[in-house]
């Protein structure tokens, strides 16, 4: 009878502990810059003094696919006596983005909460380029930047559609390229706008058409002058060499003819003597 009462008392205490134990999160959404560090935090309340030996805390990423994921979060155990389960992730990468489940077990009681981590990389550096289309009065304006998530590109006050494409870098970032081809009005400059919808961030770059424009190919008029010049120079050099050769042959023949009579006269004089 006493044993039964003890069992009932123990079970009642366990239910009370389970009812009192709760897990909360001070922050559900973390938006972190790519490459920086982050600490995801869960708070727990035991209702009394914390028994560190009875606590088990873990942070698990909720995967939507079957690909293996290496958990990179490290539990900061020095925070446990304060009722905090803090998980540190260094140098946040794109693959770290997603939803996480913070699970804390305290004896027979347990509870969990969800945390969401989003990664952003600002399109702060926009590279611009101006290209003159040969044999036309059109130009190609290019804006290119790298960031995350995928940004939208627009060209304000332009009715001509732009050709915008993107690719992924080895780090998982997006390299976005937008090309606009048009006949520019005199004295007008243009700008491209990168709008990152998920993090509500806007970046703008201006393009000055007065700056030096690079032709797509070498000017054809240079070829029209250079090639005939080379041909004429080659013909001139070949003609000079041929004339010089003929002149040398004539001079050699003239000297040979002059020497022969002198030799004959000498032979006749010797015979007479």
Swiss-Prot record:
Interacts with PDCD1. Residues 242-273 are cytoplasmic. This is Programmed cell death 1 ligand 2. It comes from Homo sapiens. Residues 20-220 are extracellular. Residues 1-19 form the signal peptide. Residues 122-203 form the Ig-like C2-type domain. Involved in the costimulatory signal, essential for T-cell proliferation and IFNG production in a PDCD1-independent manner. Interaction with PDCD1 inhibits T-cell proliferation by blocking cell cycle progression and cytokine production. Highly expressed in heart, placenta, pancreas, lung and liver and weakly expressed in spleen, lymph nodes and thymus. One of its GO terms (cellular component) is endomembrane system. PANTHER family: PROGRAMMED CELL DEATH 1 LIGAND 2 (PTHR25466:SF1), T-LYMPHOCYTE ACTIVATION ANTIGEN (PTHR25466). Belongs to the immunoglobulin superfamily. BTN/MOG family. Disulfide bonds join 42-102, 143-192. The chain crosses the membrane at residues 221-241. Induction: Up-regulated by IFNG/IFN-gamma stimulation in monocytes and induced on dendritic cells grown from peripheral blood mononuclear cells with CSF2 and IL4/interleukin-4. Keywords: Adaptive immunity, Cell membrane, Disulfide bond, Glycoprotein, Immunity, Immunoglobulin domain, Membrane, Receptor, Repeat, Secreted, Signal, Transmembrane, Transmembrane helix. The gene is PDCD1LG2. CDD domains: IgC1_PD-L2, IgV_PD-L2. Residues 21-118 form the Ig-like V-type domain. Glycans are attached at residues 37, 64, 157, 163, 189. It comes from the Eukaryota. GO terms for biological process: adaptive immune response; cell surface receptor signaling pathway; cellular response to lipopolysaccharide; immune response; negative regulation of activated T cell proliferation; negative regulation of interleukin-10 production; negative regulation of T cell proliferation; negative regulation of type II interferon production.
